Amino acid sequence: MSVDPVATTPCTTFITLNSTKTASYNSSTAVSIDPIATTPCTQVITINPSTSAVSSSAAVSPSAISSTRIAVTSEVASSIEVPSSVIASSSAASTAEATGSLPTSFEWSSSGPLISAEAGSGIDGIKDPSIVYYDGAYHVFASTAQESGYNMVYITFTDFADAGSASFYYLDQSPIGTGYRAAPEVFYFEPQKLWYLVYQNGNAAYSTNADITDPSGWTAPKTFYSSEPAAITAARGSNAWVDMWVICDTDSCYLFSSDDNGQLFRSSTPVADFPSGMGEPVVALEDSQYALFEASNVYSVGDGTYLLIVEAIGNDGNRYFRSWTSDSIDGTWTGLADTESNPFAKSTNVVFDSDAWTKSISHGEMVRTQVDQTLSISPCNLQYLYQGLDPAATGDYNTLPWSLGLLTQTNSAC
């Protein structure tokens, strides 16, 4: 049994303690007690502080504890009998979470191109990916670019080694429809038990789906605003309103967007009202046009810390990412790795597995295994799916042959 559809890799066993202070162990029913646990766990322990004893013949793995956010604290452990193997595993996981932090500089390795436009499709580039790992597979949503404009595609695979041979489902075949749709973000909105795909269509749009594995199930576009907000129109000039990004905390859902003119905007609505009621956008961060260009991501990295990533255009004309942190989504952003000489990700701090196939590290997304609206990621061993481009490519922007590659952090602090 799984208590929530997001718990796609349920635990195989579980232990609970009842009011009689005895342990109850069940190995025949698979239960996940965390609705966003996608990492397999071999055993789960739930501890009532009033209990005094628990025994088990097997240990709880650190990965299980990490994925379900359960740990045996020293205070609780001192008052109950817990197998040493369980305490050791719990301590290891708790310590890893407590000490895990983002470094102040980043180093990466990169794959070669993993996903490119299908030959004969008429599409020139695959861009702007969003990715989650769910139900034993990676699910990628991306923009398709060609001379006539943009739409979106869905691709799924179980291993990055198979990404290049995965089938494409073009989302203009779904109720999302034809026309301008681009730069998707996907997440599971747990309060409504629905997947959301947020994207741009000249406005800030979204579609929903009860089943991420059914690409035909996405609803027709709806928008967060009836028209472009006045603050955006006034700020962007002749540039575009692009790259919508939603993240929620316990109280509010926030919509970030860029104006390609050096300003990052934020608006919000109560979680209970989402997706309705988005307020007037305010400036969350600003800089010169190319120093704060587009393609923002915001993530929760634990301990009340949020990570912001925004794409910039360097002095060499190539794309790269800057980063900041904050103690709240609507708070002040403090530079982390936020300069061209100390970037979050740029060709200068990336080592390629083979040839350096791109000089631009552009619009992408962290690989997320926790798929809900909080966009929670571990600060350790980051992976980032990004768009890159052959430096020799020329032509109209829409026809450039962007492909997707994978960054893997090589200097994790935890």
Task: Label every PLM stretch briefly.
Residues 1-99:
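Fungal extracellular serine/threonine-rich, low-complexity, intrinsically disordered "mucin-like" regions
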Residues 96-414:
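Carbohydrate-active catalytic/glycan-binding domains of CAZyme proteins
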